[in-house]
Design a protein with these regions (language model features):
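Glycoside hydrolase catalytic-domain groove-lining segments
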Residues: 213, 233-238, 242-311
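A short, well-structured beta->alpha microelement
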Residues: 242-244, 417-435
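Substrate-binding cleft of secreted/luminal carbohydrate-active enzymes
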Residues: 306, 319-355
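Short, charged N-terminal beta->alpha structural module
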Residues: 220-222, 230, 398-421
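Active-site mouth of glycoside hydrolases
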Residues: 24, 29-253, 258, 349
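A conserved amphipathic helix/loop scaffold
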Residues: 448-657
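Aromatic-rich peripheral "rim/lid" segments of glycoside hydrolase catalytic domains that contact
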Residues: 343-397
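Short, well-ordered secondary-structure micro-motifs within conserved domains or adaptor modules
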Residues: 434-448
Length: 657
């Protein structure tokens, strides 16, 4: 009865409600409240040359191993150069730059008068892809097909006729892209294993888009061509989080043209790599990006690629532990899937690009001989746990505050600080109409913080009406700041240093690059530095409250090592105090609450390499009635205590007594 209540209540509390607004084809592909686990696939024997070196027996064995280990969702890539091997035949003399005819193959054969031939598509490759689909269907494996692949592991596999042409703008290239897409989708749409189409692999870097107008024109053309040929399946957008309209591939545009949006949150680029691989920073990166993308873009999001450079980052066991916590974190934010890069290692291959300097060739879940790494068991156990649950889907967690941010690093930093403070955040673009909320965070408010006049007036109106606003200063020059924040700048000098900020019951070290001092006008000073200068203020604005931090520590913490082990999160907790039904007392053991009827599902995740063994605080009048975990040997709730091994998670069902 309890589990039936959870299922029914999910319809009332968010996850199913949002599903109604998305296309039916999308919800059927990756429903909310579950995490599909999968991989990106190239054949173990030949990688990017699998189609020209087709070996059905090897492929069948690959897919057998994957399906036996619970990996039933694959992203599989038709190598564009192999599937459309067209050559441009040029004139000479004054017309040297004019294409007179397009032929196929290095032997320059005339285009056959067939549907494939007129599209410049090699019939043999399509037949092989159809055979692949049949093998996948037999194994119960679903397929995502990025059609214009294209970009792959630092190399562009472009048809010879299109070499050195911009695929986003060149008319000749666009014509052949359209023919290719129409041919491939029309031919392959009968294959039941295919569940979604995609423009290509990381298609935004197939070439160089000049601006967002060109990006939209190209993506609209590609997606409409796919949908005309097959309106029954979802079409996935290009990857990545790009909040501002000023970007070349803005997420709002991408989402408007797509049924799904995706992240490729590798943890070895940029500042996410500052802390250890199994630290809270790394473990939450995929969840933060995917949550922000879905909320800002307004379309369901999932992790389409993710992986690790093992030798550089951690041990094999470390990857398995990392994956466990990462999956729990993704589930808590209602990411829909996680596909690892990639299924099989690409060791021992001298073909380009695997013999080049940049690629890491040991990224697989399995070695080339198909033996599994420890992370495979992690994926299998997580998938099995979901199948054993008595409820269909995890209801979405209700957000406690809205974060307005554009910068990727600030978004992730804000997510960490919020979750450490017990706040479940929602994200929104400061350029778009603001969602209603009781509390808004405006971290790293550089300049006008991307707020237009309309958005700033809207935000002030919400605060005046009773909402809370937090702003961290970064040479901010929004109008009426003295009135809103109750402070004014009295000193600014470009020299670095360290403030030790005293909040009374805790202290936080704040590194800075610019020294600033502020005068309190109508604001109350809540914290001071070692010189007695105010660093954190509170001001009444209408019926609402405004908090100001003179340090944009959300940004500066992210640029440095180990900052998330400090008490910085307590600043956010001061702004938005939250009481949970279950509280762990450890900033890195996150709890999210998911409402069902009169009860709660609490997802508890240890985002630390250190075991957690403590009696949590359970709110008076509530009791834990059931649990679930993917690692029962490491995660337990017994006699009122939670025991979580490193990077482990547990689900608690909590009901009123």
């Amino acid at each position: 009865m309890l589990m039936a209540t959870i299922v029914a209540s999910a319809l009332m509390f968010g996850w199913a409600e949002s599903a109604v607004s998305m296309p039916c084809r999308a919800e059927a592909f990756l429903p909310s409240g579950r995490i599909a686990v999968g991989a990106n696939y190239w054949a173990s024997h030949a990688a990017t040359e699998m189609w020209r070196k087709w070996d059905a027996k090897a492929v069948e064995e690959d897919l057998h191993v994957l399906s036996e280990n619970g990996i039933n969702l694959l992203r599989v890539f038709p190598n564009w150069a192999d599937f459309q091997p067209i050559h441009a035949c040029f004139l000479s003399g004054d017309n040297f730059d004019k294409v007179y005819e397009t032929r196929m193959f290095d032997s320059e054969e005339p285009l056959p008068d067939t549907p494939c031939g007129r599209a410049g598509v090699d019939e043999r490759m399509v037949v092989r892809f159809e055979e692949f689909c049949d093998i996948a269907e037999k194994r119960g494996i679903r397929l995502i097909v990025p059609l214009l692949t294209g970009q792959m592991t630092f190399r562009n596999f472009i048809p010879p006729a299109l070499a050195n042409r911009n695929p986003f703008s060149d008319p000749y290239a666009l014509m052949w892209e359209g023919r290719y897409l129409e041919c491939m989708v029309s031919r392959l749409k009968a294959k039941k294993a295919i569940v979604a189409w995609e423009s290509g692999n990381e298609a935004r870097i197939l070439g160089r888009s000049e601006n967002a107008f060109q990006s939209e024109a190209w993506l609209r053309y590609v997606h409409q061509t796919i949908r005309l040929a097959d309106p029954s399946r979802p079409v996935i957008g290009v990857d990545g989080l790009s909040v501002s309209r000023e970007g070349v591939w803005p997420s709002a545009m991408n989402a408007a043209l797509s049924d799904y949006v995706t992240t490729h949150p590798y943890g070895f680029w940029g500042s996410v790599y500052n802390d250890d691989f199994n630290s809270v920073r790394s473990l939450t990166f995929a969840a933060a990006q995917t949550l922000a993308l879905e909320q800002i873009a307004g379309k369901p999001a999932f992790v389409e690629e993710h992986g690790s450079r093992r030798q550089e980052q951690t041990s094999q066991r470390g990857v398995a532990d990392y994956m466990r916590a990462m999956l729990w974190n993704l589930w808590a934010v209602d990411a829909k899937a996680m596909l690892w890069w990639c299924a099989y290692d690409q060791t021992g291959m001298t073909i380009a690009p695997y013999n080049w300097r940049p690629p890491c060739v040991e990224l697989g879940l399995f070695r080339r001989d198909r033996t599994a790494y420890p992370a495979v068991a992690t994926m299998r156990k997580f998938a099995a746990m979901q199948e054993k649950l008595s409820f269909a889907a995890l209801p979405r967690a209700k957000p406690d505050a809205v974060v307005l941010a554009v910068d990727d690093d600030v978004i992730h930093s804000s997510y960490i600080l919020a979750r450490q403070a017990g706040i479940f955040p929602a994200f929104a673009s400061p350029e778009e109409k603001l969602p209603d909320a009781d509390c808004y965070f405006l971290p790293d408010a550089q300049g006008r913080a991307y707020l237009t006049i309309e958005r700033w007036e809207e935000l002030k109106s919400k605060v005046c009406g009773g909402a809370t606003l937090y702003l961290s200063w970064n040479d901010t020059f929004l109008d009426s700041l003295e009135e809103v924040t109750g402070v004014e700048v009295s000193f600014r000098e470009k020299r670095g240093g360290l403030d030790i900020c005293d909040f009374g019951d805790f202290k936080v070290e704040m590194p800075y690059a610019i020294k600033r001092k502020f005068n309190a006008l109508t604001a109350e000073t809540l914290a001071r530095n070692q010189d007695g200068d105010g660093v954190f203020f509170r001001n009444r604005y209408g019926k609402g409250t405004v908090y100001l931090s003179i340090h944009n520590f959300e940004k500066t913490f992210y640029e440095r090592v180990g900052r998330y082990e400090s008490d910085g999160f307590k600043i956010w907790a001061t702004v938005r105090p939250v009481s949970r039904i279950v509280e762990t007392g450890d900033k890195n053991v996150f709890v999210s609450e998911h409402v069902f009827g009169g009860g709660r599902i609490c997802v508890v995740v240890n985002n630390s390499p250190v075991p957690y063994d403590r009696r949590p605080t359970v709110a008076e009048g509530w009791r834990v009635t059931d649990t679930a975990t993917d690692a029962p040997e490491l995660a337990k709730f017994k006699d009122g205590r939670i025991l979580l091994g490193p990077n482990c998670g547990i689900l608690l069902i909590v009901e009123r007594k």
